[in-house]
């Protein structure tokens, strides 16, 4: 197989006219589970290494299973683990989400690890990425900075205050808003309230800042209904709830349906 593109994910999310992408969110560290969820009409799959329990080996295999199912895989790394970001791109990830990017310095360090010169100092070694995509070494090197994405999480008061400066960093492609952590931060720890009208005001302001900088906006939605609201708000990429939530909701629904039929 000879390829000409990583997978088209970066072009689509950057285009601004994708219609809004919906991604699975997986913390359960089972590559086969990735393959199963990727059969659904998700536009992508996110593996969560920050709060999920993926390690490097399982994440690399999860990326492979996502690609086998025809879906791009984005990975959220642990806080500050930029070396892991480079390794995951080598394994074939289409993008990296970095949590707790609170300053220009954080954003530059992240971009430095995920982009080849002149944008950064990513080290060479994308063997699995080339296997997955069919790209030659020369083509991968020439296109990787454009066709993989670096996404900074905005989830603290410091990050919100520095959002324009963070968005201005070369090599940073977009932001991912963590509304749960941001709601905790903005209330000084008083409440977890990611889906309130007050939070919507902040989200809309961040979308506007992304548009001003020519970058894309991503966000976590707690469920499908909320994901739809966020797409309508103007986000380019949304999560429609986490794997554990969807798994348990499906099981609970099946049990409830069976008991209802039994009692009728």
Predicted regions and their residues:
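Expand to "…catalyze enediolate/carbanion chemistry for C-C bond making/breaking, isomerization
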Residues: 1-264
